[in-house]
């Protein structure tokens, strides 16, 4: 059955700290194109790779990868809250195949996800319940992180598993590109913040609002040039886009975790979701990128990209 891909950045600051209208119009046009691409493909199933931002996965038990057979959106930053329409049978089938491939992936019957999943689904298909999904969490913010080669192998294993489902599968990667938002690092965080990173589930409305306001303020400061966070790196972003489009994904195995941070910020690791999605596409054979959008958007603290791709018949 056919497969297709849409990889996209997300930002909780969309609609909260927006750039000038010309940039918004360009982003809106790119998402309009992506939505038409998805609608024309008409997926039976969306396999979505996304990170978490200490809203659903914490240091009390923090796997590098996790497949959800059921998932609940926490509704942060105004995203849709509630259960995703998860295809449980497909999730189990994918998990079994991935484990059989030698990739040690965790599995959850009660996964909690945040805007990394919800915003992508809402932007592409209108709702977290519009199309059955298999949500796959990839740790992208909480050190220690494994080598990116394992992410590529995970994606390939998921792609092989998806090919057996007899469904039209859309692979979605949500995150990145270069960005260094104010996400706390466990090694340097004060004790009270560490406790929240270990088990910060179910914050009060006031606690969540205060946390979100800090990020909004950071976005405003970053756009004004006064934030003490790492700059965006459009050269790095474009290099990543070129490598993913080339289909030669094994070269990514040489990229070190330190290199990601030095070049593109701590949260650049979110491009692991793109790497997994493209690797899943590669399991079906050659692919062709059909559209690419990229802009530096300081107000959203993100090198912001959107790409689509289709399989190429041999």
Swiss-Prot record:
Task: Write down the top EC class of this protein.
Answer: oxidoreductase
Q: Does the keyword Kinase apply?
A: no
Tell me its EC number(s), please. Answer: 1.13.11.16
Which reaction is this enzyme known to catalyze? Answer: 3-(2,3-dihydroxyphenyl)propanoate + O2 = (2Z,4E)-2-hydroxy-6-oxonona-2,4-dienedioate + H(+); (2E)-3-(2,3-dihydroxyphenyl)prop-2-enoate + O2 = (2Z,4E,7E)-2-hydroxy-6-oxonona-2,4,7-trienedioate + H(+)
Alphabetical list of HAMAP family matching this protein: MhpB (MF_01653)
NCBIfam families of this UniProt entry?
Answer: PRK13370.1-4
Reported cofactor(s): Fe(2+)
Whether Metal-binding counts among this entry's keywords is no
Alphabetical keyword list: Aromatic hydrocarbons catabolism, Dioxygenase, Iron, Oxidoreductase
Q: How does it assemble?
A: Homotetramer.
Q: Family membership, please give it.
A: Belongs to the LigB/MhpB extradiol dioxygenase family.
What's the protein here called?
A: 2,3-dihydroxyphenylpropionate/2,3-dihydroxicinnamic acid 1,2-dioxygenase
Pathway listed: Aromatic compound metabolism; 3-phenylpropanoate degradation
**Protein source organism:** Rhodococcus sp
- A GO term (biological process) for this protein? 3-phenylpropionate catabolic process
Q: Which residues form the active site?
A: 115 (proton donor), 179 (proton acceptor)
Gene3D superfamilies (alphabetical): LigB-like
Q: Which GO terms describe its molecular function?
A: 3-carboxyethylcatechol 2,3-dioxygenase activity; ferrous iron binding
Could you tell me which Pfam families the record lists for this protein?
A: LigB (PF02900)
- Role noted for this protein: Catalyzes the non-heme iron(II)-dependent oxidative cleavage of 2,3-dihydroxyphenylpropionic acid and 2,3-dihydroxicinnamic acid into 2-hydroxy-6-ketononadienedioate and 2-hydroxy-6-ketononatrienedioate, respectively. Also catalyzes the cleavage of catechol.
